[in-house]
């Protein structure tokens, strides 16, 4: 939880409702963990851009997940992914699921929501986090989606299909 506090703060400002149920240490005793309960929430786009910063700022690995979250927030969200050259280009893949995006340049994308995502067949982007956000968006899309070339996801997330199915996904 120590490295997600800023992300949770941004989500709270967007209207995300959750409750911390339990705080505890990881098995090795070095990391603080929590169990969360989430509640249905009406999200609103933040007035400021969402961008990663060095610690204690928003973690660069978590920034792409705000792109799929922005598809469900009322208003327009600016995601500024300045660290990785051209990674924001991969966020345009959300359009195949009927997201409403506008790529300003290879680092900045505007996402307008809320959007009712629809099933589609998509080839997985080669970058891990953009591939993961397509998978997450597909889980929230109406209908049955097909995600091809999932090597990057399998490489980066151990047993992801089993873990998501345990949470109620149908993959």
Q: What spans do the regions from the language model cover?
A:
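Short, structured segments at the rim of ligand-binding sites
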Residues: 1-171
């Amino acid at each position: 939880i120590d490295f997600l506090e800023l992300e949770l703060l941004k989500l709270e400002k967007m209207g995300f409702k959750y409750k911390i149920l339990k705080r505890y240490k990881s098995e090795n005793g070095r990391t603080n963990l929590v169990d969360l309960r989430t509640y249905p929430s009406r999200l609103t786009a933040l007035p400021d851009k969402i961008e990663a910063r060095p610690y204690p700022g928003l973690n660069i690995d978590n920034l792409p997940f705000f792109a799929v979250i922005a598809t469900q927030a009322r208003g327009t969200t600016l995601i500024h992914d300045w660290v990785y050259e051209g990674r924001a280009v991969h966020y345009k893949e959300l359009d195949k699921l009927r997201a409403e995006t506008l790529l300003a340049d290879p680092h900045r994308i505007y996402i307008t929501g809320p959007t009712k995502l629809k099933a589609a067949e998509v080839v997985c982007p080669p970058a891990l986090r953009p591939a993961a956000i397509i998978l997450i968006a597909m889980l929230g899309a109406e209908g049955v989606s097909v995600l091809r070339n999932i090597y990057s996801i399998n490489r980066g997330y151990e047993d992801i299909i089993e873990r998501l199915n345990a949470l109620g996904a149908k993959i």
